[in-house]
Amino acid sequence: MEFSVKSGSPEKQRSACIVVGVYEPRRLSGIAEQLDKISEGYISNLLRRGDLEGKPGQMLLLHHVPNVLSERVLLVGCGKERELDERQYKQIITKTINTLNETGSMEAVCFLTELHVKGRDTYWKVRQAVETTNSSLYCFDALKTRKGETRRPLRKLVFNVPTRRELTLGERAIEHGMAVSSGMHLCRDVANMPPNICNPAYLASQARQLAEIHENLHVSTVGEEQMAKLGMNSYLAVGRASANESIMTVMEYKGAVDSTEKPIVLIGKGLTFDSGGISLKPGEAMDEMKYDMGGAAGVIGTMKAICEMKLPINVVGILAGCENMPSGNAYRPGDILTTLSGQTVEVLNTDAEGRLVLCDVLTYVERFDPELVIDTATLTGACVIALGKHASGLFSSHNPLAHELLNAGEQSGDRAWRMPLWDEYQDMLDSPFADMTNLGGRPAGAITAACFLSRFAKKYNWAHLDVAGTAWNSGANKGSTGRPVPILTQFLINRAGVELGE
């Protein structure tokens, strides 16, 4: 898909289609008014007849509008002008792209980026249009023998900006939007792969492929033998019953002018399949446990995005690859594990395994002397119950870091909601036999999981994103969403001091 920006009048555009907005009730946007004037009232006459009300997502495709050079004009319902917000804007873009794809318009000039969206500038509107377009066109058919093909797919989209001085802003928005989209695409591809293909070694191979393209990215791996020497007994216990070796992939991106600048560390939980182990999960929807590596998929996608943007920042990405299976060699409820930090954990449930992997990684990354650490994981079903599929759960022991992440979520549209991490919850992890248990009971499950992790993140500023509800969709639209790539990438853009809006 090719994107560009221009600034010009709609009637002068030579294109297969131009896209303009119509507000409710039957009120032309400024650009649509220009077309109506040049076509001597052709569009307003259609609206008076009731062909389009202007409700959000309504579409009306016109052919050969008088005095307009474009072959087609697509009128897009935008709802009430004062109510056009971020969510509605992205929904309109998605519906527009789907319609253009169906009409056979291989190229189009889109004027929807000139609509007024509350509190958002041209940069945001163009970038979100790029990301939304790419996301709506995504299709995972790598393993299908018959691939669905659109007869004449949309190949080129031009976004119009109000003035020529905003062209540079629009170009920057496209560049950033394409990088984020590229990262989301990789995240979705990796996460959607079946577990017989996507195992910890596959995660490592995907990281190496990325390093072959980008010279400032270096990839190394830590296998089970090295983990044993280090004392990562908790991580090793989880993967012990699997035929696939546990592999921790370390991705080091050096983009800062000062190579000694402290890195930001991103950790992604990479359970390529989670059966629950001895505490076996129910059979229903167990196939979706291939998505338990959604955190790792998000980290590798983010690393790709920052490589493409060449952000002037140092970042370490960790893919904590592992598989949780039952066998005679599996770890058991009742086992007590000594973690890399030296703290001991009583296992109450082998299906609370993600935290047992992450706790050793949180200790391991101390060697990088990090500026800060963010771990992201499809950690708890409790977070899905609490927040559903719209917001990721955010936990942090550092208020400024939490606020930065919340802000990045609002900017990118990949929102998070901060949850408490109060000391009162820590008592729920008490064990009579070890320093702690790996399960705090049914109440506040997402919080007690974060409390567990916080015990291993005392030596740096730390945040935890629980993406169990946001990393993938179930049902008819089953598949990876590409989250949390947008929020993590936006956070790093902000940290790198890259100029964005007007």
From Swiss-Prot:
Compartments reported by the entry: Cytoplasm
Binding annotation for Mn(2+) 1: D274, D351, E353
GO molecular function per UniProt: aminopeptidase activity; manganese ion binding; metalloaminopeptidase activity
InterPro entries found in the cross-reference section: Leucine_aapep/pepB, Macro_dom-like, Peptidase_M17_C, Peptidase_M17_leu_NH2_pept, Peptidase_M17_N
Cofactor binding annotation: Binds 2 manganese ions per subunit.
Named cofactor requirement(s): Mn(2+)
Cellular component, GO annotation: cytoplasm
Catalytic class of the enzyme: hydrolase
Signal sequence range: none
Binding site for Mn(2+) 2: K269, D274, D292, E353
Entry-linked Pfam families: Peptidase_M17, Peptidase_M17_N
Record field: catalytic activity: Release of an N-terminal amino acid, Xaa-|-Yaa-, in which Xaa is preferably Leu, but may be other amino acids including Pro although not Arg or Lys, and Yaa may be Pro. Amino acid amides and methyl esters are also readily hydrolyzed, but rates on arylamides are exceedingly low; Release of an N-terminal amino acid, preferentially leucine, but not glutamic or aspartic acids
UniProt record, GO biological process: proteolysis
CDD domains hit by this protein: Peptidase_M17 (cd00433)
Keywords, ordered alphabetically: Aminopeptidase, Cytoplasm, Hydrolase, Manganese, Metal-binding, Protease
NCBIfam families per record: PRK00913.1-1, PRK00913.1-4
Function, in words: Presumably involved in the processing and regular turnover of intracellular proteins. Catalyzes the removal of unsubstituted N-terminal amino acids from various peptides.
Similarity section: Belongs to the peptidase M17 family.
UniProt protein name: Probable cytosol aminopeptidase 2
Species of provenance: Shewanella oneidensis (strain ATCC 700550 / JCM 31522 / CIP 106686 / LMG 19005 / NCIMB 14063 / MR-1)
Gene name as annotated: pepA2
